[in-house]
Amino acid sequence: MMGRQSRQMAMIFVDIESLIPETHLLRKIERMVSFDFIYDLLAPYYPATGRPSVDPVSMFKMLLIGYLYGIKSERRLVEEVQLNIAYRWFCGFELDDTIPNHSTFSKTRTRKWQQSDLFQKAFYEIVKQCIDSGLIDGEAMAADGSYIPANVSRESWINVETEVEQSMQSYLDSLDEELSNQPGFKKPPTKIVRKCRTTSQTDPDSGYINHGSKRGIGYLMEATVDCKHGILTGVDVYSANEKESVLILRHLERQINLGIPMSRLALDRGYETGAVHRGLELLGITGYIPAIQFSNPPEKYGFSYDPQLDAFICPEGVPLTYHRLNCSKSTGKYLRCYQVEGDACMRCPKRPSCFDKAGIRRRVLASSCYPAFFRGHQRVGTPEYLAMMRLRKIWAEGSFSVLKREHCISRIRKRGILAATEECLLAAMALNLKRMVNAIFRYLQIYCSAGTTMGFSSFFAFVNRSLIVPYLLSYWRYGDDKRRVETPCKAAGVGAPNIELPQQRPVSDGTRGAGKKKSTQQPITVGNENCWLRLKQSRARVCQPPGLQNFQYRNGCHATLRNVAPHCILGTPVWIFTTGAIRNS
């Protein structure tokens, strides 16, 4: 007979959390990341009396959902949270709770959140949690900038003429101090110049994009990414008419001051200046930057540079030593002047072709930081350089591609430098959360069986405390049966007894292929703690403190652990073993 759906109203009790799949992204984020720090950041901006406000953590999570799932409109975001159970659960709303109005976001953002610098602090708090989990080590970093169009029309473009003070280009305070101590340094005289800048009437903070084939009004987003798992460690937003090479050193210095490790960094050709090379050295970073082929280098005329002497060697073997700094009056930039000492050039047979008749010695002008410039060029073409360039293309350029395609910053929707920075930080935070939880779950090989073994809440509290997380990935062959059982285990103490596995029988599913063995999940014992064992082949890969030297199964088989090797998972030392052949006792 034909069935009909009953429309009668029924009252039921529902646990919202039970409706969210174990593998859902928001469930992973909720278990791995704590947002309680937001209460401490915003406490000074909420009065102690009065009617309670909307929970700021719930509102912050709503904004994150918008950038995680590409929901650009805040009106639509409120509708999606109203309808989507997973979104409600993640934000802490029950089914009968009222969702905040879309206007609440704009009022709260301008009145409280922008004053507290919440988004910048929240971004670095997430990065700090990634560092504590071992997902960021700074061994391979990449930085790049990307131009993002602003939300303005072509008719709003205007040319604004401003008066600015022309001064020495400042890259880094320590670099400026080092330059001022060199011979020949003279601070250029203060000079007021008039500059014309293209911007928009509707968004005066934006600037003109003139980069390759890109044209328009927008912003420059500068970002640094750790190539281990693609976690973005720093995001800054500037007007589009700023130069990347001038901004990069202070961008990196801010991250180092916040405790972000950074040892090797890959950059593109746009950062190829002597000041950037020297600034990276002062920051303790090894830089990998493609070399620009200049049209008129000293090497073209047979000169070579000797880094030990800090001198150029002419074709006749005479050194041109460093003499002093020369300042260009038109640009305010400094150049290192190398010249021949004495009258060696006057007796040289190549003098007529080397320089004009009025001169008495040959000079070579180079970058004010040429020694660091040369050291950076020495790394070009090495295996490390090629590897870093590949990582830069994957993680730096790839991250910008993902941010623009999936996380709402293909175009800046709000207006003003503060609002543009907020958008870029939220998008970067959303990408970091995705990569963070996926990396941790990939490390620990977590499946739903973990919840039945030791409980998700206790397990993730265990992980977040950065304790030892021994994880057994063992492979064992039981006759012709290949079983796979997998989940993390609790810490087994040093000197734990043998692992005892309950003997299992093949199970038939009664359908096609009957007689084949099904994968089953059975708990085993390590010391006094329950864990799970992954069984697949006759080789074992075990992560566990030392002291456990062999397996003993209930059927009487033994396997000796060999090839002990230390590894690091989530910043925690673990030991990986491989077993020899399984034998009967």
Specify the residue positions occupied by each region the protein language model found:
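Cationic, low-complexity basic patches in intrinsically disordered or flexible, solvent-exposed regions
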Residues: R483, L501-R505, Q522-P523, L533, ...
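Basic, short loop/linker segments at the boundary and entry of helix-turn-helix/winged-helix-like folds
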Residues: E22-L64
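Residue-identity detector for glycine
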Residues: G451, G455, G479, G493-G495, ...
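Short hydrophobic alpha-helical segments enriched in small aliphatic residues
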Residues: V463, G510, T520, E529, ...
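Short, intrinsically disordered C-terminal tails of secreted or membrane-associated proteins
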Residues: I576-N584
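Anion-binding and metal-coordination hotspots
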Residues: M2-Q5, G70-L83, F93-E500
